[in-house]
Amino acid sequence: MSIYFISDIHGCYKEFKLLLKKSFFNDKKDFLWIAGDLVSRGPDSLKVIRYLYSLRKRIKIILGNHDLNLIAVYSGVKENKKENYFDEFLSAKDNLQLINWLRCQSILKIDEERKIIMSHAGISPKWDIDTAKKYALEIEKCLSGKNYSSFLRSVFNNKINYWNLNLNKLDRLRYSINVFTRMRYCYPDSRLNLICKKSPNLVKYPLIPWFKIPNKIPKEYSVFFGHWSSLIGTKVPQPFFPLDSGCCWGGKLTMFRWEDKKYFFQSFQKNNS
């Protein structure tokens, strides 16, 4: 039994299936951890979701910002846009079943035995592991509940970029969503910058990659995350493992096998249909 990690599939079904074959993933005995953004940008979001649903006993999924966007579009909270490639999903007969499954997935995964953490974007430098688990669970309860559309209607907010214990519940949820699904850069005081998406090689102080801010994560933990394709070519310190290599932008998909610490790659296929 092996554990594989991947992120930011973004509807690139063809590349995803090729990478599973290349990495010798066995859907009868192995496990696949996916750090979010299953959908959008690429052409085959519905195929990706259906395939993952068929593997649901062998996978652990973290929701990313694009997955939340799909749920919001489906529920009428957000407008569908051409670049989402959601039309096929929205007209599918099984979309309710798939949405109800998707919105019950996690925001954070932690394996305390193997010392593994997985988040789509990262973990606030202000939080220890227990705090991160607490606020991830708070989001998960809202998403999996019957009033999930009301939650999504109120939770998206760029202005909540700081953490303190006096935040009201809604602002706490807004901050937590931003951390887990959208964070890239922080200021030295750990405030979030939710605008800049550039490579750290092109960005100057006071913007600092979140994983270079002093944090409260125990040193023995490995942290897997996606969301940030422009990290390609940037030296990221251990124990952080970025997985987004920009397949939907013409880059590649990256997969990491835990047991032997081996990477596998699959380049974008130009004739992707």
Curated annotation (Swiss-Prot):
Protein name from the UniProt record: Bis(5'-nucleosyl)-tetraphosphatase, symmetrical
UniProt cross-references to InterPro entries, sorted A to Z: ApaH, Calcineurin-like_PHP_ApaH, Metallo-depent_PP-like
Broad EC category: hydrolase
CDD domains, alphabetized: MPP_ApaH (cd07422)
Pfam families the record matches: Metallophos
Family: Belongs to the Ap4A hydrolase family.
Catalytic activity: P(1),P(4)-bis(5'-adenosyl) tetraphosphate + H2O = 2 ADP + 2 H(+)
Keyword vocabulary terms for this entry: Hydrolase
Reported function: Hydrolyzes diadenosine 5',5'''-P1,P4-tetraphosphate to yield ADP.
Keyword Hydrolase: yes
MF annotations from Gene Ontology: bis(5'-nucleosyl)-tetraphosphatase (symmetrical) activity
Keyword Transcription attributed: no
Record EC number: 3.6.1.41
